[in-house]
Amino acid sequence: MTEEYWKGVDKIQYVGHQDKKSGLGFQYYNPEEEIMGKKMKDWLRFAVAYWHTFDQRLVDPFGDGTAQRPYDKYTDPMDLALAKVDAAFEFYQKLGVDYLCFHDRDLAPEGDTLRETNANLDKVVDKIVEYQKTSGMKVLWNTSNMFTNPRFVEGAATSPYADVFAYSAAQLKHSLEIGKRVGSENYVFWGGREGYESLWNTNMKQEQEHAAKIFHMAKDYANEIGFDAQMLLEPKPKEPTTHQYDFDAATTIAFMKEYDLDKDFKLNLEGNHANLAGHTYQHEIRVAREAGLLGSLDANQGDKLIGWDIDEYPSNLYETTAAMYEVVENGSIGPRGGLNFDAKPRRSAFAPEDLFLGHIVGMDSFAAGLRVAAAMKQDGFLDNLKADRYSSYKSGVGADIESGKADLKSLEAYAIDKPQSELIAATHSDHLEEIKDTINHYIIDTLSK
């Protein structure tokens, strides 16, 4: 039996609206409760991010790490890596989640060669697979870290150096093999350094062609080895590069269509990345779902006062409600999607239990958002609003426009003699402030029950 790492923490339970002083517990996330015919746990499919939860030391550009973790006593890199697996699976069991996500380099230290690195990684993956057999834990997605090591200083697939491209492809090959071993439901590509610092010395077309080339290689090899995962691209506009090629959902979808990737790839969308691109999280989810390309979600939030990616645990109920309304409209997050907490505690929240507290607020916030979104959907509130707003397209000239019967000549004949007073009279106030007030009341009323 392994040692207990998270001492003093019992399995987190649904406690409802009890006083928070009663201890750790979920107020809104009740995994077995049915919402619109589906269990909450199946709507949300929560996952824990290995990197932020078990590897993140809470460093910032101005100070060393503050994190206190129960496995800090291990100094040998491989001993530490194996101890983290024990701690991680205890954490999953106590938190009550079914999924994890990881980069290859989250799990094990690198060696001098890729062969040595793969051997280290395989030892840790062996242990994860054994835990999966006894715990039932599943992998929502895995991926390759091709941005941290100095060899990726100018990108991986988009590097100007062929040796780096070759190394990246070899690393990716092994990561796909690991994905098959652990039964990963998705495989994510986040191009951490797939972009440029300056256009003056950049062949942008060649770099994007190389990125598409490695994505096709990945899908081809996954098919070859029987790794049936949904491939996902994750947009982010900047940081660490000045400009990244997968800027936002719309840009990434255009890239996918340009290079014939949209049949095999979907999108993994993150809240903080949406903010950096100048969008709301809801906007990015809407763009993806209406294109039929919503794959999975990373759950976190940014700060409008801070211009970088802070990966804060989500707590804004208005934002989680908006995100979950898009999910409810879609019928699910995606064919195999989930909500991965790509989030970390603040540097001042350094105690081990803060990892539980952060996940609890995130899980409760999205569960609350689901409850409110379902209430609005079941009442038909927003559906009725939109149906009324666009009702002019149900008959007359509007119906002709919708059906394709109208053309420029027929529309000119219809509009050319209409006085401005008649056109203005056809418009109506949308009472947007009332809509926002009503949404506020849905949040307050639904969550007070």
Swiss-Prot record:
EC number per UniProt: 5.3.1.5
Induction summary: By D-xylose.
Taxonomy, superkingdom: Bacteria
Binding note for cofactor: Binds 2 magnesium ions per subunit.
Active site positions, chain numbering: 103, 106
UniProt cofactor(s): Mg(2+)
Binding-site residues for Mg(2+) 2, renumbered to this chain: 270, 273, 309, 311
Main location: cytoplasm
BP GO terms, sorted: D-xylose metabolic process
Gene3D superfamilies attached to this UniProt entry: Divalent-metal-dependent TIM barrel enzymes (3.20.20.150)
SUPFAM superfamilies according to UniProt: Xylose isomerase-like (SSF51658)
Subunit architecture: Homotetramer.
Alphabetical list of PANTHER family matching this protein: PTHR48408, XYLOSE ISOMERASE (PTHR48408:SF1)
Family per record: Belongs to the xylose isomerase family.
The protein, known as: Xylose isomerase
Lineage: Bacteria, Bacillati, Bacillota, Bacilli, Lactobacillales
Gene assigned in the entry: xylA
